[in-house]
Amino acid sequence: MLHSSLLDNTVQLAIDDRVLILNSAADPFVPKAAQQVVAGELLLAEDNIALLQSAYAALEREHSMPGGRNSLSRYRHVPFHEYTLREAPATIDVAVMNMLYQPSNAWLIYGLQVTGYALKPGGRLYVVGAKDRGVLSMAKRMQTLFGNVETLEISKGQRVLCSRKMDRGTWSPDTGQISLVPTIFAEGKLDEGTRLLIEALEVHTTDVALDIGCGAGFIGLHIARLASKGQVTMLDASLAAVDVARQRAEQGGLTNVQVLPSDGVQAVQAQRFDLVVTNPPFHLAGIQTTEIAERFMREAAQVLRPRGRFYVVANRFLKYEPTLRACFKIVEEVGGNTRFKVLRAMDPIRASTRPGDL
C-alpha cells in the first residue's frame, strides 16, 4: 500500500515515544511502528472492531517473527469516539492518521480535535492521504488548528502532512468535551432507504430477530417494539454505533434488545433467527462495492431459520439478486420506490443441514 510506504519513509519515532494511531489500526505501518517504540507505547484509537482484530493479528505476527521486538503489552486499544473521555490530555508524542480509513469528513475533523487534546507540546501529527480524498483541504484544517503544516512527501497523488503542536495554543483539557457521535448520527432522522425497509417489514410478536450493521439502531428498535414477546440482537462493527444504539434502546425502555460489537455475524454465528434485516453500506474506503452487502447476505443465510425471512434494502442500480438467489430459494421485491428496492429472501439453501435449525 503506497500510503503505508510513505509513512514508513517520513514518520520519525523514538524508542520511548507514546504513539497514537487515529482510526487507522489496520494500516500496515502500525506493526512497523510497534517495532520502533520498544520502550514506549502504541495506542490504537480505533472504532471498527473488524479492523482492530486485523491490527491485533498483524501485531502478533510481527511479534512472533524472528527478531520481532515489540512486546504485546506495549499496545492497547481505546474506542476512537471515547478517547478524550478515557485518556489524559497532552500525553502523546506522535499521532498518525490515514485518511483512507475515515468514513467521512466528520471523522477527519474529530481526529484533528482528538490530536490537539492528546499531543504534548511539541508533539507531531502525521496525516497521509490522496488528493481525491481531500488531503489539500486537510492541510488547510491542520494549518488552522495547529498554526503550521508541512508537506513532507508527495508521490502519485498521495501526500504526507505534518503539524506540530505549539507550546502555546488553543488546546486545553476543556476540549475533552469533543464528541464524534452527534456529527455522524443525526438525531431522529431516517434515511430514505431505512424508512422504506421499515415500511416493508413483516414482524411477528414472538420473532427472534437480528439486525446486521445496525448503525444508530432505527431498524432494530422498530422491530423490538413490534416483537414485544421476542428478542432482537443488533450488531455493528462500529463501536460508536453500538454505543448509540444501546443508548437509544435504554431511552426507549426496550428490554428485549441486545447490541453487540461484531464483524458481520461473528458474535452470533451459533444462533438462529426468525427475522434478519440489513441496510448495508455500499462504499468501502470511498469506493463503491457490493462486497459488504454480499457478505451480509451469505451470513444471513447461515443464521436464518428455514422458515425465516431476510430483508435487505438497496439502491436500484445495485445487483444484489444473483447473490441472494445463490443463498435463498425464494427472492422477491416487497417494497421501494424509483431509487430504492426492498428485497425479501426466504428458505435459505441447505438450511436443514445446519445444526440448531428448527
Locations of regions flagged by a protein language model:
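Conserved SAM/SAH cofactor-binding pocket of Class I
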Residues: M1-R76, E192-T278
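SAM-dependent Rossmann-like transferase core, predominantly class I methyltransferases
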Residues: L2-L6, T151-V208, G215
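Short beta->alpha hinge that forms the Motif I/post-I loop of the SAM-binding pocket
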Residues: D47, A130, D236-A241, I292, ...
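Conserved proline-anchored active-site loop of SAM-dependent methyltransferases
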Residues: V94-N105, I212-A216, F273-I287, A300
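N-terminal auxiliary segments of SAM/dcSAM-dependent transferases
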Residues: Q102, A106-T175
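A short glycine-rich, Lys/Arg-flanked "PGG" loop and its adjoining helix->strand segment in the class I
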Residues: I109-P121, A293-P306
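Glycine-centered, small-residue-biased loops immediately flanking beta-strands
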Residues: G123, G230, G308
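Core SAM-dependent methyltransferase catalytic element
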Residues: R159-G176, K329, G336-L358
